[in-house]
């Protein structure tokens, strides 16, 4: 009897080719698109390359018809609201910079989809993610599109039921396969933005969710001297230079957000660099738990190339990451992910420098 696999189909080329490859490998493939957005107007206007708009559903359905596999749209709105939107808003209200895609991967695209898939008798779920899976995840062959940073907090149970069939292919090869078999999404652009804020106006979105406007306050320098007025903490993130509206003879950047005093601390570039950061909410992938210092490569944001560091386990279960060279703008709320030999060792949330 064929093993059954549910493929999360975003309407993009990666998940479409993943479904094709799994069918070729002999699996009983079912395509599913996750309907996650509550606001129908935003759902309709979601950008062409997005993963949750009407165009995504239409594209995924056309691919499923071309591959001759069953296809369904499943409602995950409640889970998306709880685990992604509410988290996103809460973090910004705390003057932190969240990773909504990481939360979506763990709690919606994996936990919720896997639960629903096992209920209908599936053995696995599969995605178009580009890493390669105690279970671990290896860097993709496509460094520019590697998604392991956003997958660090998957559980062992989730990984044991996960297939990632395109992990050994680079993006040009994936598009080539799609063209060769006549998939209608072969040249479709990759999605880049947060899908539920297509206009990038985070402050208006958060105001709509909370019913509260962000409060103006003071820009201050590192000594506490007032430099001007800011528009509200949610408009700023660590390392930001543009849009400050402050005149200065030298470039200035956001150094710190202080929700307790509603202040934005500004600094010169050199003050953004530091060697250490504390990381909490650790998910261990290649180890049960660290008990002694280890060497690793640390990534402190999605676009970060990674840098050598030493991880020091702390008595409270957190990690102190000490980088060999100072790193720029380590930002509370962002994920820090650590690698050994191209495999994800562990990761967590940056709490402070």
Task: Give the predicted meaning of each segment.
Residues 1-152, 163, 172, 179:
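ATP-dependent adenylation/nucleotidyltransferase module used to activate substrates
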Residues 126-132, 136-353:
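AMP-forming adenylation/ATP pyrophosphatase catalytic core
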């Amino acid at each position: 009897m064929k093993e059954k696999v549910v493929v999360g189909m975003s309407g993009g080329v990666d998940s479409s080719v993943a479904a094709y490859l799994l069918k070729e490998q002999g699996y009983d493939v079912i395509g599913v698109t996750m309907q996650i957005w509550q606001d129908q107007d935003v759902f309709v206007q979601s950008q062409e390359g997005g993963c949750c708009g009407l165009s995504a559903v239409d594209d995924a359905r056309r691919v499923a018809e071309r591959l001759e596999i069953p296809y369904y749209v499943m409602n995950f709105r409640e889970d998306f609201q709880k685990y992604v939107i509410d988290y996103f808003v809460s973090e910004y209200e705390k003057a932190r910079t969240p990773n909504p895609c990481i939360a979506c991967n763990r709690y919606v695209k994996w936990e919720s989809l896997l639960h629903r898939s096992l209920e209908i008798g599936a053995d696995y779920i599969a995605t178009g993610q580009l890493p390669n899976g105690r279970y671990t995840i290896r860097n993709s062959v496509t460094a520019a599109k590697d998604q392991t940073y956003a997958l660090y907090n998957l559980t062992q149970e989730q990984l044991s039921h996960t297939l990632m069939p395109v992990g050994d292919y680079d993006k040009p090869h994936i598009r080539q396969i799609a063209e060769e078999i006549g998939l209608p999404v072969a040249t479709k652009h990759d999605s880049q933005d947060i899908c539920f804020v297509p206009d990038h106006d985070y402050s208006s979105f958060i105001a709509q969710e909370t019913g509260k406007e962000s409060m103006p306050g003071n820009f201050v320098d590192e000594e506490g001297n007032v430099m001007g007025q800011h528009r509200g903490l949610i408009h700023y993130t660590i390392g930001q230079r543009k849009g400050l509206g402050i005149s200065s003879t030298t470039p200035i950047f956001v150094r710190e957000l202080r929700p307790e005093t509603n202040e934005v601390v500004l600094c010169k570039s050199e003050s953004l660099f530091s060697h250490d950061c504390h990381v909490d909410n650790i998910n261990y992938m290649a180890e049960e738990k660290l008990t002694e210092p280890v060497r690793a490569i640390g990534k402190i944001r999605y676009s970060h190339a990674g840098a050598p560091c030493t991880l020091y386990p702390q008595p409270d279960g957190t990690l102190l990451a000490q980088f060999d060279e100072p790193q720029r703008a380590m930002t509370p709320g962002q994920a820090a992910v650590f690698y050994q030999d191209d495999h994800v060792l562990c990761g967590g949330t940056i709490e402070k420098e």
